[in-house]
Amino acid sequence: MKIIDSHLHVWSNDTNKYPLNPERPTLPEGNATAEFLLECLDEAGVAGTLIVQPIVYGFDHKYVTECLHKWPDRFVGMCLINPKDPNAPAELERLVKEEGYRGVRVNPGLFPQGVSLDSDISDRIFEKAEELNIAIGFLINPEHFDAVDALMTRHPEVQVIIDHFGRCKAEDISANSPFQKLLSMARHPKLHIKISGFPVASSPKAEGVGERSEQDWPYRDVQPMVKQLIEIYGARRLMWGTDFPFIVRQCGYTRGLTLLSQETPGISPEDMEWLLSKTVEKVFGDFGTE
């Protein structure tokens, strides 16, 4: 079975060649180079990945772009848009047409102070994404679900992905929980969910990225969320991701795969194939050979 990791980040240890985002002047702990990632992929039998532009570089895509060009058979890219830049749609077009990015990430935490995610800034991003025929990925909290709901109602032809279970927590999937709101948004046929970031979704709430220990694996309290998402969205609208490099110190890269592929019972072989590769290729195109 072909396996594609739909969500991870890479960065270099060389901060002179690849300067850091001034607002994030320190690299997170751990090795996140593309070379180390490839070692992890080969060990786990993962064919390719969607690299999401990391916040450590802000809107400077130099390192990720070099990785995409150097290993085009393994990597596909999702760029990060600057919602404060009035020329952001033009820059998005350049990144897609000249550098080969196949999607764009939107982070409401980067919007101008006091400006809602449900605003004309997002409308312009949606319009450009539809023109370019690319997907939009959202890093959001449950408080932003209503905004994404409204945007998708206005722009129903755009493929949208919500990362990391929408940052819902396994400890509360009751009738009035944010997770139930996420399930209700399945009425948008082009909305997809990344089943990524298992350790952070797991209960009790993680005390920052990477705080869940290896002993917590395989995060069985997250499994009911996965099963409800499959039931409501269908596996064809879900995609698995590790959130490398953070997964490495949370439980190890290979275990970040097997927690779904081997440790989550009741998923049919056909559904598993969609979760592990077919959905992400449906949205982003081919990721090279198996």
Language-model-detected regions and their locations in the chain:
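Active-site beta-loop-alpha junctions enriched in small/polar residues
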Residues: H9, P54-I55, L80-K84, N107-G109, ...
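Mid-to-C-terminal alpha-helical segments outside catalytic/metal-binding sites
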Residues: M1-S6, P25-G48, K227-Q228, I232-M239, ...
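Catalytic pocket-lining loop regions of alpha/beta-barrel enzymes
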Residues: S116-M239
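Hydrophobic packing residues within well-ordered alpha-helices of enzyme cores
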Residues: V64, V148-L151, G256, L260
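Mid-domain alpha/beta scaffold segments of enzyme catalytic cores
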Residues: M1-R124, K128-L132, R220, L260
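Short aromatic-enriched loop/helix-cap "lid" or pocket-rim segments at secondary-structure transitions
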Residues: N13-P19, K62, A90-E91, I173-A175, ...
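Short catalytic/ligand-binding loop motif for oxyanion handling, primarily in non-cytosolic enzymes
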Residues: S12-D14, G58-H61, Q113-G114, K169-A170, ...
